[in-house]
Amino acid sequence: LFLYPDDSDEAGNLLRIYQEYFMVCNGAQLILKEVKEKGYDLHTLPEHVAIQINDTHPTMVIPELIRILTTEEGFTMDEAIDVVSRTCAYTNHTILAEALEKWPLAYIEKVVPQLVPIIKELSDRVAKKYKDEKVQIIDKDKRVHMAHIDIHYGYSVNGVAAIHTEILKQSELNHFYKIYPEKFNNKTNGITFRRWLLSCNHELAAFLTQTIGDGYKKNAEELQKLLEHKDDQAVLDAIYDIKKTKKTELVSYIKDKEGVELNPDSIFDIQVKRLHEYKRQQMNALYIIHKYLEIKGGKKPSTPLTFIFGAKAAPAYVIAQDIIHLLLVMSDIINNDPEVSPYMKLVMVENYNVSYAEKLI
């Protein structure tokens, strides 16, 4: 299986459906197996399991669970739908089209024909209850709207920021919000300091423990105690030294991985995330070009600048691939220009992943 197939043609779309079904099929079977092994009645599944559907890619877990419960576990269709609807919840991360998948029914029939009768049943139930075309599961063009399955047959729908959730409720998913206002809620995205502090920055974690105690490891709000030391120069100097140590480690890591020598005393401007037009890496690139021209014109920055990018782009996303190419060409020009490189460097890290993120972030 290719991790990121080119889905610009039918073969790529079919492969993506294969991938999605492969994952949810295995996951669904494992979940039900573990619940049964613990001696629980599958009719009580929602009491023991919560399945979070992140964007629409795992949506087929809903009809797959219904299929297993009805064909292998003796459930009626009504019982299976009820249990699954109280087990699955949907998170919408973005309103971009690629996160709201719409698969031709014919494609699903080619890959997982066993799910088609169930999807049609779910669609028919919605169509009998609601006449609005905008909330149908199978539309007039015979496309299956995966997000619509999640919303109709899940117990919760959440966005990942307050403004995002309001957009879902008032605009993008307003037709559903009018039907199921009680399902919509917000869960603001965040980070776990246990990963990005305790695991990735042992020096800073040890210093915090020494300065404010270790209560913050279980209660993040205790990090606010650090504000009591905001005017303590010794504390500020210690944090600065730790930051410099970590920057030096990152410089060494990038030198080893990318072969680029960076200045640890420069300002690090880091943008690491999936490459997409709306993430605006191209805007950052234009700024770097502007700074390059300024330096060439004699306007040197008081502190050297280092720009670090890390990203992946879908194989069929031509513009995103072009932006990566642009950044690579720019890095070659900037880093090899003796007039500019002492004041500015650019590196596009290869194979950006969690291990790299732990160093960069």
Feature map (PLM): residue ranges:
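A conserved ligand/cofactor-binding region detector
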Residues: L1-I361
